[in-house]
């Protein structure tokens, strides 16, 4: 094979630079895309429907709800995945990073609230006691985050 030869794809007599559409109707392609897009798989462990392709590609699904039956380790791993997801979403511009930090703070506050609700339940506590519980929970989350 010579390096300087010029090759042409398609049919003889066809214009150069114009690709011939092998399938005249686009119905097949559209339906194929729709199958990928709308094919959802029921996950019994989470009790919800998820896009099968996305679930296979990434372990983390941002829309997955908080599960109060998670163990502490599973919850911490889930929280870290949420943080990584938020950081990946912010491309690297300072504005996006600031927004990602705010989102993470909100996510962390939500998790602390959920932990507090599971620990305390409907018991009436003072604001000072609530702040103390929140601080203990945050300290535990941070310790577990940076534990080797």
Segments and roles (model prediction):
Residues 1-148:
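Long, non-globular targeting/processing and low-complexity regions
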């Amino acid at each position: 094979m010579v390096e300087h030869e010029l090759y042409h794809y398609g049919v003889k007599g066809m214009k150069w630079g114009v690709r011939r559409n092998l399938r005249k109707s686009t119905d097949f392609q559209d339906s194929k895309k729709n199958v990928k897009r709308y094919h959802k798989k029921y996950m019994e462990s989470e009790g919800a429907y998820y896009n099968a392709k996305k679930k296979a590609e990434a372990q983390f699904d941002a829309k997955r709800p908080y599960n109060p039956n998670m163990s502490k380790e599973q919850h911490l791993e889930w929280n870290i995945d949420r943080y990584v997801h938020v950081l990946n979403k912010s491309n690297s511009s300072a504005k996006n990073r600031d927004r990602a930090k705010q989102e993470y703070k909100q996510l962390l506050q939500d998790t602390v609230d959920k932990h507090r609700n599971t620990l305390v339940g409907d018991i009436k506590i003072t604001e000072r006691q609530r702040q103390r519980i929140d601080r203990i929970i945050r300290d535990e989350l941070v310790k577990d985050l940076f534990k080797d």
